[in-house]
Regions:
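Tubulin/FtsZ superfamily GTPase core signature
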Residues: 1-284
């Protein structure tokens, strides 16, 4: 990348510059060629800087030249994981340009190229347009994408955190999480807060809200694998009627996926019923 495009406040030890590549000017063909030629540089940097890991998360911006070329390093990424005897996979998180950005035919072509490359790999796509609509009017234009990225990072970290917690009701453990993350093709992740857990059609409301408010592109198909994590407070946990509603909600969401993992957690300060939903193996 060019010097001006390097991220601010990032320690040099966390940055690897590809030799003789002063930007690729939105040219995916050139970007892939450069990355393949320097795959050993990237692989060596991963091994020396990260050491032994189980999972490798690759973040790439769709539409640009460098980000849209990222999958050219997939072989190097997997070779690195194999060399450290990792138990996980390479997982991609890519952005999809906004509607205005897609008016640029080069950006649209590059984004589609990346999406095509990723279609059979485990990945999440973040829809910039959808995120902008959710946040528009709430934050200024300078804070739009930083806020969206932080919200997504928080959602993902909360999912990981719940997978490490024990539950006296129903647990979603790290092995369940790994099973979901290893599923090839696209994954959708979304969350919602429902104040009244006794609302009719709770399952439908959870499903629709999580898909609608997800930063990922909407899906209309069933998934191969999924997870529904529910966080309730102590009062809800003691209510037998709510227990029936939760069971029905889990069954409803389970009808949209071939395999569903679920977890129910009691947190004293929960603002209501907090639901986090994963849908993996999506083909659209």
């Amino acid at each position: 990348t060019t010097e001006k495009d390097q991220p601010d406040n990032v320690d040099e030890q966390h940055l690897v510059l590809i030799p003789d590549a002063d930007g690729v000017a939105k040219n995916v063909f050139y970007g892939k060629e450069i990355l393949k030629q320097n795959s050993a540089v990237v692989e060596d940097a991963l091994r020396t800087k990260l050491g032994k890991v189980d999972w490798l998360f690759v973040l790439c911006g769709g539409g640009g030249g460098t980000g849209s070329s990222s999958f050219a390093l997939d072989e190097a990424f997997n070779r690195y994981l194999k060399s450290v005897e990792a138990e996980g996979k390479v997982f991609y998180i890519a952005t999809w340009p906004s509607a205005q950005e897609l008016l640029n035919s080069t950006i649209a072509k590059n984004a589609m190229s990346l999406a095509t490359d990723l279609k059979d790999a485990p990945h999440i796509i973040l829809d910039n347009e959808k995120q902008m609509k959710i946040l528009r009017g709430k934050v200024g234009i300078l804070d739009l994408f930083p806020t969206a990225n932080k919200a997504f990072a928080k959602l993902l970290s909360q999912t990981f955190k719940l997978a490490s917690l024990k539950s006296s009701i129903q647990s979603f453990d790290s092995k369940d999480l790994e099973r979901c993350m290893k599923e090839n093709k696209r994954m959708l992740i979304g969350t919602t807060v429902i104040k009244n857990a006794q609302t009719p059609n709770l399952g439908a409301q959870i499903l629709q809200n999580c898909i609608k408010r997800s930063p990922c592109p909407t899906t209309h198909t069933d998934s191969n694998i999924g997870a529904l994590l529910l966080v309730i407070n102590q009062e809800m946990a003691s209510d037998p009627k709510i227990s029936q509603h939760l069971d029905a909600a889990i069954s409803y969401v389970g009808g949209r996926t071939k395999t569903l993992f679920s977890g129910v957690y009691v947190v004293d300060n929960a603002p209501g019923l907090v639901a986090i939903m994963l849908m993996g193996g999506l083909t659209e």
